[in-house]
Amino acid sequence: MDRAIIFDVDGTLSETEETHRRAFNRAFQGAGLPWHWDRQLYNKLLAVTGGKERIRYFIESFDAPDVPAVDLDDFIPLLHAKKTGAYTEMVSNGEVELRPGIRALIKDARAKGLRLAIATTTTPANVDALLAVTLGGSRDFEVICAGDSVANKKPAPDVYVLTLERMGLPA
């Protein structure tokens, strides 16, 4: 029987949420928005998975000031792209590390013949940046399902089901 380990990224491979929060704030500043997510607010916003979804939730549920008078379906992806750019730059500058023991766990799992994959709601660019800086790339992972590869984000199991399908493993 094939055995596999499927990793999430944020909070599993690495503690990234503070870096994500700061990247959102850089994106807001770069877009000329007066928004600032402090830690307390960001912890509330983490109830929603997905960066684009989190921005929409903030706008619709927290009386965001100075929301541009544009179609949010167009605006949010552009703003999120700025956030992704800020985040990947921060990761490339070494601001994010693997959690202790992760590198050894991956090495041991590979040595034992376990198959490895990633199932996450973060964007592919974020995953690529983290893996490039911390592990020298994605070669240890057979499958990476990230971002908008599924319609329903966590806690829905869709990204895990898709990962298992791509690995040829039963759910």
Regions found by a protein language model. Name each.
Residues 4, 117-119, 164:
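Long alpha-helical scaffolds
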Residues 35-37, 66, 116, 138, ...:
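Residue-level detector of short coil/turn "hinge" positions at structural boundaries
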Residues 93, 123-171:
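Substrate-recognition "cap/lid" segment bordering the active-site pocket of phosphatases
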Residues 2-9, 13-100, 107-112:
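N-terminal helical cap/lid subdomain that shapes the substrate entry/recognition surface
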Residues 98, 119, 152:
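Residue-level marker of regulatory loop/turn positions in helix-turn-helix DNA-binding domains and
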Residues 6-8, 117, 145:
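Conserved beta-strand segments that form the floor/walls of ligand-binding pockets within enzyme
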Residues 17-18, 49, 121-124, 157:
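Alpha-helix N-cap/helix-start capping motif
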